[in-house]
From Swiss-Prot:
This is Membrane protein insertase YidC. The chain crosses the membrane at residues 3-23, 363-383, 437-457, 476-496, 507-527. It is a multi-pass membrane protein. CDD domains: 5TM_YidC_Alb3, EcYidC-like_peri. NCBIfam families: PRK01318.1-3, PRK01318.1-4, yidC_nterm, yidC_oxa1_cterm. One of its GO terms (molecular function) is membrane insertase activity. One of its GO terms (biological process) is protein insertion into membrane. It comes from Burkholderia thailandensis (strain ATCC 700388 / DSM 13276 / CCUG 48851 / CIP 106301 / E264). The lineage of its organism: Bacteria, Pseudomonadati, Pseudomonadota, Betaproteobacteria, Burkholderiales. Its main location: membrane. It is found in: Cell inner membrane. Required for the insertion and/or proper folding and/or complex formation of integral membrane proteins into the membrane. Involved in integration of membrane proteins that insert both dependently and independently of the Sec translocase complex, as well as at least some lipoproteins. Aids folding of multispanning membrane proteins.
Length: 557
């Protein structure tokens, strides 16, 4: 029997490992067993002798024939382009005059001596990574992202005392149409105004459409080991609300999303940060998501423009968000935009938990202590359930010697052994599963808190005490993972010893296995689990001691 159980445990363990490896590969992570074929990005960052960026041109050249109604993918003309560098209080970036494309955008957040430099590059057009925001016209041979624009004269930095910075770019005349594209940056804001003025300088009416798209490769962003957050396009409409689209679904032509709307937005989502085009509410638009190169994808909207007579013009305004996934800020920008902060399937529980965590942080001013206090509050709320669980485990621990005696007596007759055990449970009024149900009820809450701490950009660069300077990074000295292992070991000792030796060994092995994982988890997550375990040990010790005192008093009387 022991050999059979050992074999079953080995099969279970290997199955779990293989399932985890398959999960890793399905989410774009390297396999533990099978080597990945290295994919190279076709976009180049070569520059010409005059400082012109060839990256956008290379990306454009890589695009196959576009789907009907999607943005053009014509070969870029030979005209030279250049990069226009700009800076605001929250951004440093580059606009490529080829298409007036936002080709590089760095979110600047300098360190203050106590906290590290938290600057991060979101948009980029390098040899190993492509992520762009671009616009253009459809419906004829009109200016698009392949044409070289001319920068209008003006400042490129947000000066002290200045609240806005405008950068304007003018296209060449194509098809009797000229486009003036204006980016408006506002102090303290991660929302960029993008205005497209379409001038008909020809002799016949034109009916163009404006496309706005985000182009990105499938390069994964750095996340903690054993953790996964969503990376890919997303679409939000009033019809279907938030729809995430994986790169693998696009590869398989299985992308499911609303293709026409007059509301909502489209986005590219990654861990902690996102970008989103937000067209004018009420403006009809078509939505497209597609693969345009072996490792390059795009999500965009195509917005029709009413007929423009010769000598007349039309204006199309939109907003481009590019910044951190700060929930409260996102709620004020556009309906549903806060959903880019990915809580997975536990959103309904995770959002209230983050709200509570945020309120606690408002009082204590430290995210580490906010985690400690929130965990304490959750344990207090669930104390009645935990007490019921610990009481059941304590009663099981009391009758364990008698259970072992029955198993030894009837080891050759499993049917009689089970009947004797059931009679013992009935006599002692013990439910062998009584300790499980209260724990199962609490699991969704603890999983939700896990996702809150994993997905919240507020943890990035947030210190706690002493050696913990960033709750989003692993403990540099592994002190918290060691405390986690010790707390799990203590919990194991407090629980009833399984009668099966194999199960007993597995219970002893679990703290070691989990500790290995927690060595790579963000410090904020490990802090939560350590505090939760310490409080659980204290609760269990208190309840067990109270029950023991009550039993001794009853026996004495």
């Amino acid at each position: 029997m022991d050999i059979k159980r050992t074999v079953l445990w080995v099969i279970f363990f290997m199955s779990a490992v293989m399932l985890f490896d398959n999960w890793q590969r399905s989410h774009g992570r390297p396999s533990m067993f099978f080597p990945n074929v290295t994919q190279t990005n076709t976009a180049s960052n070569a520059t010409n002798g005059n400082g012109a960026s060839g990256a956008s041109a290379a990306a454009a050249n890589a695009l196959p024939a576009a789907a009907t109604g999607a943005a053009p993918a014509t070969t870029a003309p030979a005209a030279q382009a250049q990069l226009v560098r700009f800076s605001t209080d929250v951004y440093n970036g580059e606009i490529d005059t080829r298409g007036g494309t936002l080709a590089k955008l760095t979110l600047t957040k300098a360190g203050d001596g106590k906290q590290p430099d938290l600057s991060v590059t979101l948009f980029d057009n390098a040899a190993n990574h492509t992520y762009l925001a671009r616009t253009g016209l459809l419906g004829g041979d009109f200016p698009n992202h392949n044409d070289v624009y001319t920068q209008a004269a003006g400042p490129t930095s947000l000066a002290a005392g200045q609240n806005t910075l405008k950068l304007a770019f003018e296209s060449p005349v194509k098809g009797g149409v000229k486009v003036v594209k204006t980016y408006t940056f506002t102090r303290g804001s991660y929302v960029i105004g993008v205005d497209t003025k379409i001038e008909n300088v020809g002799t016949a009416p034109v009916t163009p459409s404006v496309y706005m798209e985000l182009v990105r490769d499938n390069t994964s962003v750095e996340t903690p080991m054993f953790s996964h957050t969503f990376l890919g396009p997303a679409v939000y409409t009033d019809q279907k609300h938030f729809q995430k689209i994986t790169f693998s679904d696009i590869d398989k032509n299985k992308a499911d999303y609303v293709t026409s709307a007059d509301n909502g937005w489209i986005a590219m989502v990654q861990h902690y940060f996102a970008s989103a085009w937000i067209p004018q509410q009420g403006a009809k638009r078509d939505i497209y998501v597609e693969k345009i190169d072996p490792t390059l994808y795009r999500v965009g909207v195509k917005q029709p423009v009413a007929a423009i007579a010769p000598g007349q013009s039309a204006d199309v305004s939109a907003r481009l968000f590019a910044g951190p996934e700060e929930e409260r800020m996102l709620e004020g920008i556009a309906p549903g935009l806060e959903l880019v902060k990915d809580y997975g399937w536990v959103t309904i529980i995770a959002k209230p938990l983050f709200w509570l965590l945020e309120k606690i942080h408002g009082f204590v001013g430290n995210w580490g202590w906010a985690i400690v206090l929130l965990t304490l509050l959750i344990k207090a709320v669930f104390f009645p359930l935990s007490a019921a669980s610990y009481k059941s485990m304590a009663r099981m621990k009391e009758i364990t010697p008698r259970m072992q005696a029955l198993r030894e007596r009837f080891k050759s007759d499993p049917q009689k052994m089970n009947a004797a055990l059931m009679e013992l449970y009935k006599t002692e009024k013990v439910n062998p599963f009584g300790g499980c149900l209260p724990v199962v009820i609490q699991i969704p809450v603890f999983i939700s808190l896990y996702w809150v701490l994993l997905a919240s950009v507020e943890m990035r660069g947030a210190p706690w005490i002493l050696w913990i300077h960033d709750l989003s990074q692993r403990d540099p000295y592994f002190i918290l993972p060691v405390l986690m292992a010790v707390s799990m070991f203590v919990q194991t000792k407090l629980n009833p010893t399984p009668p099966d030796p194999v199960q007993a060994k597995m219970m002893m092995f679990m703290p070691i296995a989990f500790s290995v994982m927690f060595f790579f988890f963000p410090a904020g997550l490990v802090l939560y689990y350590v505090v939760n375990n310490v409080l659980s040990i204290a609760q269990q010790y208190y309840i067990t001691r109270t029950l023991g005192a009550a039993a001794a008093k009853k026996k004495a009387s």
